Amino acid sequence: MAVITEHGGTTSSPPENNNSIGNGKHRVNGHQLSTSLTIPEFFAHKNIFVTGGTGFLGTVLIEALLDTHPDIGTIYVLVRGKRKFDPNERIRRLLQKPIFEKYSEKTLSKVVPVVGELSEPNFGFGPELLQELIDRVNVIYHSAATIKFSSPLRTAIRTNLTGTMRTIELAKQLKQLAAYIYCSTAFCNSNNRGLIAEEVYKSQFDPYEMMKMAEDDSAWEDFTDQKCKGYIRDHPNTYTFTKNLSENLLMAEMSGLPAAIVRPSIVYGTLEHPMKGWVGNANSGHLGFLAGFVKGIFRTMCGNANAVIDIIPCDYVINSSLVMGWYVGTRKLEQPEIIHCTSGEVNPLNLAEFCTIINDSVERHPPNSFVWKPVTKLRNGWRYNLFFYLFHLLPAMVFIIPEKLFGIGMPQHTAYEYMRVFQKGTKAFDYFLDKDFRYSLKNALRISALIPESDRRRYNFDASQCDWSEFIDRCLIGIRRFYFKESAVTTDWHRNYWKVFNVLYYAGYVVIFAVLYFALTLTLGLQIGLTLAVLIWGFLVWL
């Protein structure tokens, strides 16, 4: 069980209050619960309210909810109204994705959009819709958030903190609340060092005061970056800061209610469910790096070679969320339960190994085309900066011409735009990839041991058995298939294309040396020119 601790302080976990009435059953607020239920049995006939349902995690969550039981109830998905497509069209497009192909129209009709704003009181719902939700909803999954590390503090507070408060307010109004699950992040405590416990670490600021501040226009006049740093202090960005505030808020508000916090680390594609290698649009998070790498657009990373990159399959995050819904919904708990969904403690993968795996993987499964040979390497400091400007940014500016003329490259944005995003993302992730963060799995392992035998394989979230090479293979093939719309099958044509491109790649080094040799020997003479040509060429190869 989780309690608020002072920056890493440890307190004993309060015991479960079973209020037993025999046969593994107990009552909460007049509702009979049973610890003997399987996970599908728990979700049968349950009506669910989901925020963040149109995002990558949310989409996989909706599919997983539909998959739990044929008799699952209505899945209400919060959708913003002011978008390119109206809410019904957005949900229709979402349900056309490959992961929903196996479901009938009748089953898909259970997914219902509800238009609202996350930070508005009662989400801005009309009285009839609000009453329907109060009467019918049993489970809330809250994953909506602004995940941009560079989000202005006011925006992050309104979305991540106030938005969480709105879901809590709804949960407290529900007539039959069975479970409330908040999707946080393992990095919400990245301002701490050592082993991060599955507990809520006390924030330096009152979440209620921060919400009031977000609504006070005068507080944001002349609000500089320096003032922002005064608030987030030792947090690396507004995202982790407001996620920690949200956890503090949830602990204060949800005592005695069936609530849980799930903290995933760096979320990648799916390992098994709903299909191998599902990556969504591959635009968000670290998956965007893999998408750029597949085409040879991104070819460098910065970070400590020995630092653990704590990645986790998306379906493990969803499985842990479903398990936590079942767990808190079948027991009487005194405090919200917290688990990490991470891999670093049980199956560590360091950055050097990660780079080797993705280089080997793309060689086994090359795409239809590249901008340049996909090969990535760790660099730091001036070496990283020089390589980025010489071999990323400068070529991207030149590449604008063939992009426009022949339509090659990555979808949606130009290579130059991707480079700008890549540079910002690299700086943001550098904080996390240059340090060793360790996350306790004590609660996660304890709860996973309670999963009914019949559910353990389907709802597994134990990363200790993950084969990272196979997993990265699936992610890269998924990016080819779902993002670049290429065939997932690697043929002899792909392998021959890779061999030809390799010849051109190494021939490029010969051409560079020849240009340097002739240019320098003509101007400086044979001895000096040759020496300089070898030195410059060797430096570029090393770089």
From Swiss-Prot:
It is found in: Membrane. The keyword Lipid biosynthesis applies. One of its GO terms (cellular component) is peroxisome. InterPro entries: FAR, FAR_C, Far_NAD-bd, NAD(P)-bd_dom_sf. It is a multi-pass membrane protein. Its main location: membrane. One of its GO terms (biological process) is wax biosynthetic process. The keyword Phosphoprotein does not apply. Residues 1-29 are annotated as: Disordered. Keywords: Lipid biosynthesis, Lipid metabolism, Membrane, NADP, Oxidoreductase, Transmembrane, Transmembrane helix. It catalyses: a long-chain fatty acyl-CoA + 2 NADPH + 2 H(+) = a long-chain primary fatty alcohol + 2 NADP(+) + CoA; hexadecanoyl-CoA + 2 NADPH + 2 H(+) = hexadecan-1-ol + 2 NADP(+) + CoA; octadecanoyl-CoA + 2 NADPH + 2 H(+) = octadecan-1-ol + 2 NADP(+) + CoA. Its EC number is 1.2.1.84. GO terms for molecular function: alcohol-forming long-chain fatty acyl-CoA reductase activity; alcohol-forming very long-chain fatty acyl-CoA reductase activity. It is an enzyme of class 1 (oxidoreductase). The chain crosses the membrane at residues 386-406, 500-520, 522-542. Catalyzes the reduction of C16 or C18 fatty acyl-CoA to fatty alcohols. Belongs to the fatty acyl-CoA reductase family. This is Putative fatty acyl-CoA reductase CG8303. It comes from Drosophila melanogaster (Fruit fly).
